[in-house]
């Protein structure tokens, strides 16, 4: 399947939940892009007036190919897909695509980088930034926690596990604050298979103070919600922006890996421009 032929497809046509044959030869046609606008329409977002900037940062831990003499090379890849791309890349298709490199010979890692950049950019419909770290060069990885207030120790009763933005409230009579709030209790489900997705969610904002207990209830309300990682983060961003009216807002999540990949969406009004690729302990 050619990525350019699938840009209007929804998730139901993806390889998720289907039996597949793993390819041992390079196969860019395995990439399955999904139109972002299908789910953005539900949020009332127009493609030319998005309320956020940002990216989807992917870490690929099972990247390997053969060198010119047939010897395997192992590496870690990082892919940054801009939110302005018309398409996201379905995760199982990306895993299958990366596996197709396993028996393919490349003269040097530069060719792998260029091939990944070309194929992923074609699938997403926008330039994708690619970096590759060969394991023989001993790349390092930093683990850490967000610098902010952890919500998970708030002692509250919760009985709602379907998304409910009504939990989100701010004190509009109080002075403006600048703070970072986070939780390890984000859990949603794959849009297609229903498999659980686990993540840490971080909100950084400047504006009226957000009610922390309500925010925690809202995060937990995603527990039975079915959407892709990127779509959940955009929904959270839009709900917080509309109901809490922060002057500046950034939302990002670090999801646990599946199939050798983790996905880390980042959305911001623009004041907060980036987040560090610091691994969450479950990654």
Swiss-Prot record:
One of its GO terms (biological process) is queuosine biosynthetic process. One of its GO terms (molecular function) is preQ1 synthase activity. The keyword Ion transport does not apply. Pfam families: QueF, QueF_N. Keywords: Cytoplasm, NADP, Oxidoreductase, Queuosine biosynthesis. It is an enzyme of class 1 (oxidoreductase). Homodimer. Catalyzes the NADPH-dependent reduction of 7-cyano-7-deazaguanine (preQ0) to 7-aminomethyl-7-deazaguanine (preQ1). HAMAP family: QueF_type2. This is NADPH-dependent 7-cyano-7-deazaguanine reductase. The lineage of its organism: Bacteria, Pseudomonadati, Pseudomonadota, Betaproteobacteria, Rhodocyclales.
